[in-house]
């Protein structure tokens, strides 16, 4: 495993650990999800260029599009939650509360 692949794997693992550890605030969860998507994007682009699989060269762009959609929906949810409750706690998103 080259150092670039190792660094990207560590970046993905740290972002995943951040999602699991800092899950009380929505903003920190969204930032960690963006880190995961960015490391996946770079990994996919490097693997496609390394193995010369140019028939799947649109896959990183599609992943980037879904990442942008996820960021937009997440930020809209963050704005709506902070307007309603005054904070960005994930526990406010529980739909089973009365």
From Swiss-Prot:
Location in or out of the cell: Mitochondrion inner membrane
InterPro entries to which the protein is assigned, alphabetical: NADH_UbQ_OxRdtase_chain4L/K, NUOK/Mnh_C1-like
Keywords: Electron transport, Membrane, Mitochondrion, Mitochondrion inner membrane, NAD, Respiratory chain, Translocase, Transmembrane, Transmembrane helix, Transport, Ubiquinone
EC number, UniProt record: 7.1.1.2
Leading EC class: translocase
Gene Ontology CC: mitochondrial inner membrane; respiratory chain complex I
Lineage: Eukaryota, Metazoa, Chordata, Craniata, Vertebrata
Biological role: Core subunit of the mitochondrial membrane respiratory chain NADH dehydrogenase (Complex I) which catalyzes electron transfer from NADH through the respiratory chain, using ubiquinone as an electron acceptor. Part of the enzyme membrane arm which is embedded in the lipid bilayer and involved in proton translocation.
UniProt name for this protein: NADH-ubiquinone oxidoreductase chain 4L
Domain of life of the native organism: Eukaryota
Membrane topology: Multi-pass membrane protein
Transmembrane domains' residue ranges: 1-21, 28-48, 59-79
Similarity section: Belongs to the complex I subunit 4L family.
GO biological process: ATP synthesis coupled electron transport
Gene3D superfamilies: 1.10.287.3510
GO MF annotation terms: NADH dehydrogenase (ubiquinone) activity
Catalytic reaction(s) noted: a ubiquinone + NADH + 5 H(+)(in) = a ubiquinol + NAD(+) + 4 H(+)(out)
Keyword Translocase in annotation: yes
Assembly and interaction partners: Core subunit of respiratory chain NADH dehydrogenase (Complex I) which is composed of 45 different subunits.
